[in-house]
């Protein structure tokens, strides 16, 4: 909640949230089941009544790029409040600024962590403020950052409690669960803070496997396969090696097995030379699961200390 509890019309960040939430919702396209002209007009009216945001009919169209940008701006806004104050600083000094360089080097309030000569004329220096000498920054607010992340987790825990042992996998803002014939389905809606179905209404997951946090794959009723592994670029070549079948094989048959994928043009940063260049990168994939205790001779996990 980004409004003042005493005055719902006094929004601290309302304008910012409304702008990018509007862009995100419009670029998501029409929701499943909204097909007729009457359905579309009713959807716009319901959204305005619920969120106080007026969607533009002509602007509602699937645009993955715009949706990603709007989502990034919404999410990074909260992270900014929790940003560390004492971030490393970079300074460049020309040969005519030797006095400034030495003032920085011997400043008792600064800790110089690195410097090197770029060329005959320029010097590059990295430094940060020492301990309790960090200046107060009024653009950060740890209380807002903590409240936002805690509130999101409370919503997640509430859903996990309702689903119980039906849960197969969950992350910060997503849950994959088993749905039986008589099981009650969580409510989905297109509004802020509510659940949305990431699959089409006429499709569902039939096989699922996970090799750890942010590391899972599944196959749907319609035959679509999805594989998501943090830190791995799954372009066409790599997806021939890392996919649903290969992950399932590792988890169910040989959990010590490793797979190697290659990125022929990895963008690498060379700090000392302050340059970017492409290089060949080889990465190994293997089962890594250390956040919960794995129950022996099963695929169940339990929290540590349970």
Residue positions per predicted region:
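Conserved acidic
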Residues: 1-306
């Amino acid at each position: 909640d980004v409004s003042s509890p005493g005055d719902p019309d006094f929004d601290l960040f309302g304008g910012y949230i409304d702008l990018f939430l509007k862009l995100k919702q419009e670029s998501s396209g029409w929701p499943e089941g909204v097909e007729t002209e009457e359905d579309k007009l009713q959807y716009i009216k319901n959204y305005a009544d619920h969120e106080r945001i007026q969607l533009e009919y002509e602007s509602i169209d699937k645009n993955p790029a715009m949706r990603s940008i709007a989502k990034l701006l919404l999410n990074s806004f909260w992270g900014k409040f929790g940003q560390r104050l004492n971030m490393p600083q970079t300074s460049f000094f020309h040969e005519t600024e030797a006095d400034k360089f030495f003032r920085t080097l011997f400043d008792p309030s600064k800790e110089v962590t690195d410097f090197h000569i770029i060329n005959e004329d320029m010097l590059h220096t990295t430094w940060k403020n020492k301990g309790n000498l960090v200046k107060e920054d009024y653009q950060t607010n740890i209380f807002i950052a903590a409240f936002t992340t805690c509130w999101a987790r409370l919503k997640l825990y509430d859903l996990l409690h309702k689903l119980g042992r039906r849960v197969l996998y969950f992350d910060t803002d997503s849950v994959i669960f088993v749905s039986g014939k008589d099981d009650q389905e969580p409510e989905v809606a297109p509004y802020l803070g509510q659940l949305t179905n990431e699959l089409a209404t006429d499709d569902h997951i039939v096989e699922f496997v996970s090799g750890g946090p942010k590391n899972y794959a599944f196959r749907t009723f319609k035959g679509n396969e999805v594989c998501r592994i943090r830190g791995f670029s799954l372009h066409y070549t790599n997806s021939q090696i890392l996919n649903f079948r290969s992950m399932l094989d590792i988890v169910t048959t040989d959990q010590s097995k490793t797979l190697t994928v290659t990125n022929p043009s990895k963008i690498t940063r060379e700090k000392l030379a302050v340059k970017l260049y492409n290089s060949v990168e080889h990465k190994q994939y293997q089962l890594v699961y250390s956040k919960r205790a794995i129950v022996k001779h099963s695929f169940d996990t339990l929290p540590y200390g349970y």
